[in-house]
Amino acid sequence: RRRNLLKGAAIAAGAMSAPMIAKAQSGPINMRWQSTWPAKDIFHEYALDYAKKVNDMTGGDLKIEVLPAGSVVPAFGLLEAVSKGTLDGGHGVLGYHYGKQNALALWNSGPAFGMDANMILAWHKYGGGAELLSKLYASIGSNVQSFLYGPMATQPLGWFKKPITKTADFKGLKFRTNGLAIDLFTAMGAAVNALPGGEIVPAMDRGLLDGAEFNNASSDRLLGFPDVSKVCMLQSYHQSAETFEIMFNKTKYDALPAKLKAIIAGATEAASADM
């Protein structure tokens, strides 16, 4: 009888160990991401920081590698690449999708009254913003799962060859901006070119732009704005608040275990708190 008990225990132990062996053989889930930021931009550092949070919190069960803008696709091509599965995910801002669905820019360059960045994030999470964003993505057939984080303050008006002193100074001015601000400055008479961050300073250096705004003084300095312009005009109404976007290919996100999805959400909140 004792031999039968030992035999039964051995069979049970073997059965219990089978799933553990299968899990060990499957290994970690690896994801390749790209940001919309140049490698030297502090925003790419934020993208790397988010990936590290997820990698550490999952204990290596999910490993995210983040490449800088242009490594796989141009910065403005991130949404399509993630939707199609060319990339597993990405880090950027909703305003960069303006050409696909201009309402997406409401989260980043909306009217200069009402909500600041923290209020936008609160509305997005608790007031129906996330559901609206999902509907907008569905309207253009985008297969993505989006998370917003990281409140950012009002942006500078931009860098210019000479000071802007009146509205008329924008007439005929070759200017870089993005999102709904494209329509705003176009209506003011500017010739607007919506370039990604890494292309702005070279364009100003070649005289293709008379002025440009990107985001903040730290990023602008790292990208070389002071090398091509000595006039920086602070504060503006064109982009009073902005947030980052974390984006997954939805098919791949939906296939993740519930535990990893919870960690992704927690890492997003932690990254937002850091800012």
Residue ranges and their predicted role:
Residues 3-120, 132-275:
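N-terminal secretory/targeting leader peptides
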Residues 120-127:
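A short acidic, glycine-rich active-site loop
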